[in-house]
Amino acid sequence: MQKGTVTLICLSNKIFPIAEACATVGIRVSCAYGITDRHGPDGARRGLAENERFLRAGGRGMVGVHAAFTCTDESLEAAAGLAADLNVGVHVHVAEGKADVEAADRLRPLATDDWLLIHGVHLDDDHGLAGTVVHNPRSNMNNSVGYARPARFANPVALGTDGIGADMLDEFRLAYVRHREDDVTASPEDAWGWLAAGWDLFPEAHHDRVSWDPVAPVEAPMDPWRLAFTTGVAPRTVEVDGEVVLADGRATRVDAEEIRARAAEQAPQLHQRLDEI
């Protein structure tokens, strides 16, 4: 929110707390529990049950799949079936790395237009999967999995971060320069289109309002060419569903400094537990 982001699409194994936290802060969220067979068939079944529990309780979300290559065909089919029963899509990591190059063949009979296909780095141009491809340039570079070249896809393409922050203007700039490195004819308007596709995933966010600092020219408040080369743009005020949730750069519903202080206190305990695993 302090970066002007008012919607979150999250794949996690703690979907109830995340949804509650987002509601407390005042932003929109869509959650999915990422099922996997890495812990055996029973683990995948429990993951599906958690997705169903969340969605039937009224949570906004999708059925989550950690990554196609960590799931059996039976689990993928079960996830697709549950999503169809609940009238939601599937949120799945697809062909992020070379280990998942067979994902398209496995998912093609299952995927529908309401699916989110995350990464898609190693998909063929004509992969034949229905759904929206979500491009995560910073994450892909960090993991050294390659460049997805998202402009090649016939699918709608949206922009994401894979959990590395929530500064979507910064992600837009990175998406543009990475595209430009690959294709000298690339324009900031291409990457801006990927960013704007997020509204198709959360149509109600069209009614939310963000005012920015420094103040943009009235004639071109969100010009892709200007923003591609202007860093340091930050939100001054954020309104979600008519409510001001950020005023003068500060959250109105919660004490952000207190939250950070409590997180700093708990971080060493978490690190110690991880060391003990």
Feature locations, PLM:
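Active-site loop-helix segments enriched in His/Asp/Glu that coordinate
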Residues: 1-60, 66-82
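Short, hydrophobic beta-strand segments that form beta-sheet elements in well-ordered domains
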Residues: 7-11, 116-122, 135, 195-201, ...
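Flexible loop residues that form catalytic
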Residues: 13, 120-121, 138, 180, ...
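Short, hinge-like loop/turn segments at secondary-structure boundaries
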Residues: 24-29, 46-49, 107-109, 150-153, ...
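Active-site core of metal-dependent hydrolases
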Residues: 57-169, 179-188
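Ligand/cofactor pocket segment of small-molecule handling proteins
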Residues: 167-170, 174, 182-193, 197, ...
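Active-site microenvironment of metallo-dependent hydrolases
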Residues: 193-277
